[in-house]
């Protein structure tokens, strides 16, 4: 087991690469066995992971299972079912002047991959990339977030006991440890976190020309037009916004509501919050907490930037912030410029879709965009305006749990994608082998007949 000094950490990728090259690229069966072992590890320690997630984020048990554990198990099953098809060699031939060019294409692992997880979903965001990396045949080092220490230490103990370090290793530590790791000569770095830290990781990796996949965040807009209001829509938005106490990178960040349904929407939001979490959400067993003191301070500062329509209470002693709805926010306020990443929902009225989209109030390259509407023209306008890699109509967040949908950002929300086949492709590169087949050409009845010599 390596120490966390700079020299030991920097030697990790070389040791994993040497083992990979000496053993050769793992067979599909070997990869499936590793993934099966990972699945067994998750299932056998489900209760321990649930306790750790509650200790780190106050996560309710069902929320831990549905948003962290179940999605990992589903991903492993999907990958194991389809990996043979994704890994299949393709062939093609092209006629050139005097010869046939034969091309064989096949995916190959990068080698040793570094995965830096985030604290908001510390189990899922540490292991989901690892599933794709293992499926592609790589060796992995996982650095979980130090801001979710219970989950990080549990991951370290369980994985390092179950896997040899040359295959899969968890390294815990602070930001300095992460800096030492990103300076090491890995073949690929996968990072999930803030844009500021993501830039630092990319800059460090660029010094060694190490490719990087960045999964960042952004201000995901959610629009309710004049046709989109319903109690079901409101409940969907409230669930998605306050899941994990708002600490979800694809949560609806700011809600834009057509003026004709604005008051009705506000009333229904309050009713839905009360239905989900009761009149005293601090006492609810279905509501989590903010992860760190610094993030708690940032989120409560947002509350004072508008009129509180619902909620607004907080308690620093256990980092509780009530589900909060804000109205009448001054244009240019920080809450309208920065990613909120907490249980505070600004609700902004608008009167015209085209005017809203051209106003600059909606971040075009957010991680995702949501619209609730029955108006096909409005839906199409929104789709054309957004640069994000996913647009969800009449639902929120569900796409992130599907292995059939690539998950990733555009522009300031990151680059690269994973989940399902996209993960297999992200952690592998295509090797093309070409062969020239010499031919003789005879012209018969105006046709060219190729005869291989």
Curated annotation (Swiss-Prot):
InterPro entries of this UniProt entry?
Ald_DH/histidinol_DH (IPR016161), Ald_DH_C (IPR016163), Ald_DH_CS_CYS (IPR016160), Ald_DH_CS_GLU (IPR029510), Ald_DH_N (IPR016162), Aldehyde_DH_dom (IPR015590), Aldehyde_DH_NAD(P) (IPR012394)
Basic and acidic residues: which segments have biased composition? 1-20
GO CC annotations, alphabetized: cytoplasm
Which Enzyme Commission numbers does its entry carry? 1.2.99.10
Catalyzed reactions? all-trans-4,4'-diapolycopene-4,4'-dial + 2 A + 2 H2O = all-trans-4,4'-diapolycopene-4,4'-dioate + 2 AH2 + 2 H(+)
Residue numbers spanned by region Disordered: 1-23
Q: A Pfam family in this protein?
A: Aldedh
Question: Which GO terms label this protein's molecular function in UniProt?
Answer: aldehyde dehydrogenase (NAD+) activity
Q: Name one GO biological process term.
A: aldehyde metabolic process
Q: Which UniProt keywords apply?
A: Carotenoid biosynthesis, Oxidoreductase
Entry annotation: catalytic residues: 215, 249
Q: Quick one: which pathway?
A: Carotenoid biosynthesis
Biological role: Involved in the biosynthesis of the major C30 carotenoid 4,4'-diapolycopene-4,4'-dioic acid, which protects B.firmus from peroxidative reactions. Catalyzes the oxidation of 4,4'-diapolycopene-4,4'-dial to yield 4,4'-diapolycopene-4,4'-dioic aci.
Protein family: Belongs to the aldehyde dehydrogenase family.
The protein in question is named 4,4'-diapolycopene-4,4'-dial dehydrogenase
